[in-house]
Regions:
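Extracellular, repeat-based ectodomains that mediate carbohydrate processing or recognition
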Residues: 1-176
C-alpha cells in the first residue's frame, strides 16, 4: 500500500491525497470534522495514468492546494514528476490540469512541497538532474497563479544524500 498525505485547510477541514493501489490513480478528497465525526466530500481523480504511489500535498491558501506525484512512462520508461493545483469550495474540490515538472529528475519523484505565505511561493525539493548528480538534492521556488505554477531556477541544497532518504520542506517565518 502507499502512504496517504493530509493537510489541514482550516479548523474543521482537511484534504487527503493518495494513490489507489488497485487502479494506480492519484485521488484527493476533502474531509470535515465535527465533534468526533468526519464526513467526506466526493473523491476526485487527480491523475488517471499509472501513478507511482508517492504523493505530497500542501495548502497554498484556505481554498487552494498543490499536489505532487509521479507517473510511469516518461522517456525510456522512467518516471515523470507532475504537480496539480486544486481549488476547494466547502467539501468539493476542482483540480487543474497536470503540470509536468520542468526539470529532468532521472525518473525520481518530487520529494516535498511546502508553501511560504510571506513570499507567496511554493518550494519543491527534487532529486538530481543527471547521472552525475542523481543523489544530490535541489529546490525550486514556484509561483501559483490560478491553476498554473511558474518555477524559478533549481538551487542545489545537498551534494550526496544517501539513497532511500528523502527531504522534507518546511517554511520558517522567523528567518529569511
Amino acid at each position: 500500500s502507499y502512504p496517504m498525505k493530509l493537510v489541514s485547510l482550516d479548523s474543521s477541514r482537511f484534504a487527503m491525497v493518495w494513490t489507489d493501489a488497485n487502479t494506480y490513480y492519484v485521488k484527493v478528497v476533502v474531509g470535515t470534522v465535527s465533534g468526533s465525526s468526519i464526513t467526506f466530500g466526493s473523491t476526485v481523480v487527480v491523475e488517471s495514468y499509472n501513478a507511482s504511489g508517492y504523493v505530497e500535498i500542501d495548502k497554498v491558501a484556505a481554498n487552494k492546494i498543490v499536489i505532487t506525484y509521479m507517473t510511469w512512462g516518461g522517456p525510456g520508461g522512467t518516471g515523470l514528476p507532475k504537480l496539480s493545483v486544486g481549488t476547494i469550495s466547502g467539501s468539493s474540490i476542482s483540480m487543474g490540469s497536470a503540470i509536468t515538472w520542468p526539470y529532468v529528475t532521472n525518473g525520481n519523484k518530487l520529494e516535498a512541497v511546502s508553501y511560504n505565505s510571506t513570499e507567496d511561493k511554493i518550494l519543491v525539493v527534487a532529486p538530481g538532474t543527471d547521472n552525475a548528480t542523481n543523489r544530490a538534492k535541489f529546490v525550486a521556488a514556484g509561483t501559483v497563479s490560478g491553476n498554473n505554477i511558474t518555477f524559478g531556477s533549481l538551487v542545489q541544497i545537498s551534494t550526496q544524500a544517501e539513497e532511500g532518504y528523502y527531504f522534507k520542506a518546511v517554511y520558517d517565518s522567523t528567518t529569511n
